[in-house]
Amino acid sequence: MTEKYKKEILFVNSFRGSGIGDFGWKLKSELEARLQIKYVEISPSWKGLVRLWKTLTRCNLQVIFNLGFTSFGKSIYRNFFNFMMLKLYSTVHPLQSVILHDSIDTSNLEYSGYSNSRLLPVGGAIATIMLKNYNIFVFSKISYDILKKKYGIKNVNYFPFPAENETVLECYKQDKEPLLLNMGYIAPYKGLEILPEIKTKLNNIKTIIVGNFYGSLLSTKNGPKFKQELVTLMKDSGIKMLGYMDDARLIELVKEYRTVAILPYVSGYNASYSAIFFLTLGIPVVATNLDTFLESRNNGAGIILVNRTPDAFAAALDMILNSSDLTRSLIEDDKKYCAHYSIHNFCDFLIDVSKSVTFGSP
């Protein structure tokens, strides 16, 4: 698209610091190249939510929402209220566009780190039904099928999880010291507790975790205990936990080593921001053979999937570290994935579909 769309659009993004909000911030740059954008960011508080809906009721712009669906801990009631407001808003302004990143139906609540109430799936189903009058975009074929078949939502659009760039940076350095790297906010379902055993099986390979503990998790009854136990385990195993890094610092770290990404998830949501981000850096990824990663691999991503055991992960990682042919093949797959499914291409898809369904004529 070479000419900007003439109408101003309101882009409502989830808060930054989460994978969803960070994705939205990058999408904002793409949208601004094509549309006249008014940007609003959701603040994770009741006050912020009230402020958001005051803004929405006072403006008469077409809207694109970038939202996460699942919300746990103390934020669950606030998130449910937000979906009630979305329902009310859609009765006055139908077929607004929603980018929906995850779903209660594809979440394994047992490993979320939060109390697993029987009411949670019920509330999630009710919240999903509230979106029936929206034009929804998802990054998971599983979510697409659930929204269409289980909930009967008509306007659902699927696009594989977008890569940040159309080209791969190729940060993998065969001649440098090997490094296992995990990145993303820290929660029980990420399965990090098996990293020490994998590290040992690979001759105590240097291992680093980048990311903060998820804030709402730490406010739960078991959250502080989970954090303390994991920090102690990693410290005793010689695994560094470096906290959050912006993209520039993370890329610097990756380039210092022969970096291989490791994602030993116990369960996963619809798409892994971390996995696709690693693809854009051109570094190999080894992940648990979950549906979320299998879908990315089936779409062409250079990801090796294994059973979630230390032996299986260690064997795959050792194979990568000792085979330049394999790493080259994986990186070539990454290049093809990024070229087809970049955030640039998704933005074009989002606008084209939204214009035909929601925006009307320019």
Positions of the model-derived regions?
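Nucleotide-activated donor-binding/catalytic signature segment of Leloir-type glycosyltransferases, i.e.
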Residues: G223-I251
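Donor nucleotide-sugar binding/catalytic pocket of nucleotide-sugar-dependent glycosyltransferases
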Residues: L131-V168
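Conserved acidic donor-binding segment of nucleotide-sugar-dependent glycosyltransferases
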Residues: N299, I303-D311, M319-D325
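Acidic donor-binding loop of glycosyltransferase active sites
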Residues: V254-N270, I283
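Conserved donor-binding/catalytic core segment of Leloir-type glycosyltransferases
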Residues: K173-K190, P196-K199, I208-V210
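Membrane-proximal helix-turn-helix segments that form the acceptor-binding/catalytic region
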Residues: M84-V92, N116-I136, E229-L230
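A charged, aromatic-enriched C-terminal amphipathic alpha-helix characteristic of glycosyltransferases
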Residues: S324-K355
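A conserved mid-protein helix/loop that constitutes part of the nucleotide-sugar donor-binding site
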Residues: D22, K26, A187-K201, I276
